[in-house]
């Protein structure tokens, strides 16, 4: 196992339970109280660094509204994060609070989501990611075809995230935040569950 210092640092900062309670209290009209769990996966899933990611509303702790798997890897242009769908999401429901559920997860259970990737850069103090160009991450929602635009910023103890569904023709925001990114604070560190690399 060989991982660059930057990829190792990004994975370490990403691993954890994040929450935006402070933001939800300050701006309740615009931001719900949300939990994000970014749980390290066994090295064997990708022969590299992967995470199971789960998002849920605080008032519905047993009903995650988003489950996915991501793979972090390096390209000549820097770090990239590729998204995958779970074939049986119900089997891993609430794994953010029971990481043992993820021990049996295998690559065969995952479906690559074409175009759903984020390119990451190091700014000197944090990592910033943005959807790869091309409007290729298609999401059907409420009878409308949209493309997913994502961006994030992550530091040692915070994670800011913006996801929007946009119209492919006009780029108008169809769903997602219109008031800026969700601002999460790390509540629990999961980096001890990352694979050991040399």
From Swiss-Prot:
GO MF, one example: lyase activity
InterPro entries per record: CpcT/CpeT, CpcT/CpeT_sf
Keywords in alphabetical order: Lyase
Keyword Disulfide bond carried by entry: no
Record Gene3D superfamilies: CpcT/CpeT domain
EC code(s) of this entry: 4.-.-.-
Listed Pfam families: CpeT (PF06206)
Record has Lyase as a keyword: yes
Superkingdom of this protein's organism: Bacteria
HAMAP family, A to Z: Chrphore_lyase_CpxT (MF_01460)
Function noted in UniProt: Covalently attaches a chromophore to Cys residue(s) of phycobiliproteins.
Similarity remark: Belongs to the CpcT/CpeT biliprotein lyase family.
Record's protein name: Chromophore lyase CpcT/CpeT 3
Gene: cpcT3
């Amino acid at each position: 196992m060989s991982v660059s210092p930057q990829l190792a640092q990004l994975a370490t900062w990403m691993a954890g339970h994040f929450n935006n309670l402070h933001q939800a209290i300050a701006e309740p009209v615009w931001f719900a109280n949300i939990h994000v769990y970014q749980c390290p996966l066994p090295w064997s899933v990708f022969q590299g660094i992967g995470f199971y990611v789960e998002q849920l509303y605080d008032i519905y702790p047993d009903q995650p509204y988003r489950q996915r798997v991501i793979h972090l890897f390096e390209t000549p242009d820097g770090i990239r994060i590729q998204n995958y769908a779970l074939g049986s999401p119900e089997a891993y429901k609430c794994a953010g609070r029971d990481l043992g559920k993820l021990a049996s997860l295998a690559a065969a259970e995952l479906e690559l989501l074409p175009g759903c990737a984020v390119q990451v850069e190091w700014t000197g103090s944090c990592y910033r990611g943005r959807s790869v160009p091309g409007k290729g991450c298609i999401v059907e929602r409420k009878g409308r075809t949209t493309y997913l635009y994502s961006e994030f910023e992550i530091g040692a103890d915070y994670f800011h995230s913006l996801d929007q569904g946009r119209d492919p023709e006009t780029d108008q925001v169809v769903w997602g935040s219109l008031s800026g990114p969700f601002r999460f604070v790390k509540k629990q560190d999961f980096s001890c569950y990352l694979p050991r690399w040399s």
